Amino acid sequence: MTSPILTGIFGGSFDPPHEGHSGILKSFFREVPDCREIFLIPNRQNPLKGEKFSSSENILEMLNLFVSEFSETIRILDLELNHPGPSYTIETIQKLKTLHPNREFVLLIGEDNYSNFHKWRNYEKILDEVRKVFVFRRFSEVVPRNSKLFSQFQFLKNPLIPASSTDLRQSFFQSTIPDRIPKKVLDYILRNRLYSK
């Protein structure tokens, strides 16, 4: 019997993708060497956050430019972008398991999502559906909760890169060209006047 292919799930707005995302992916592939592939899943509307700024087409194009700099296998899936209304992780995971029955999944989330994971729809069911949840640090060391519920969580040793899509968009809104965006992505943003007033 063939072993299932271990695959990471990394969702987010990616509006725009930036060097923080790069550091996270590099740390993940380094610390989880048996993971064969990552599915990048941009969301149309996060139920705990606001609306997106860029069109689905622009986000997919930025992500294609972003992943072109990686040698590892990263696949971009648009199933949440095409989903009307908010996207829920449990529904996405269950859909992926139906579409890819030969794969076993792990989930990749940020420390902010770790802190409010109990607010996610059917969060306990999510832990039943994936082998492990990897948490990347954004601002500081995080002390894991001493709870059976959170025994499946593992923290990555990713570099703390002070970059967020929200802050980068704000820089563009203020007519400042930010750093921490890969050159190909930045060129696309400027050429298409994304995030311009």
From Swiss-Prot:
It comes from Leptospira borgpetersenii serovar Hardjo-bovis (strain JB197). The gene is nadD. Belongs to the NadD family. Keywords: ATP-binding, NAD, Nucleotide-binding, Nucleotidyltransferase, Pyridine nucleotide biosynthesis, Transferase. It catalyses: nicotinate beta-D-ribonucleotide + ATP + H(+) = deamido-NAD(+) + diphosphate. Catalyzes the reversible adenylation of nicotinate mononucleotide (NaMN) to nicotinic acid adenine dinucleotide (NaAD). CDD domains: NMNAT. HAMAP family: NaMN_adenylyltr. This is Probable nicotinate-nucleotide adenylyltransferase. Its EC number is 2.7.7.18. It is an enzyme of class 2 (transferase).
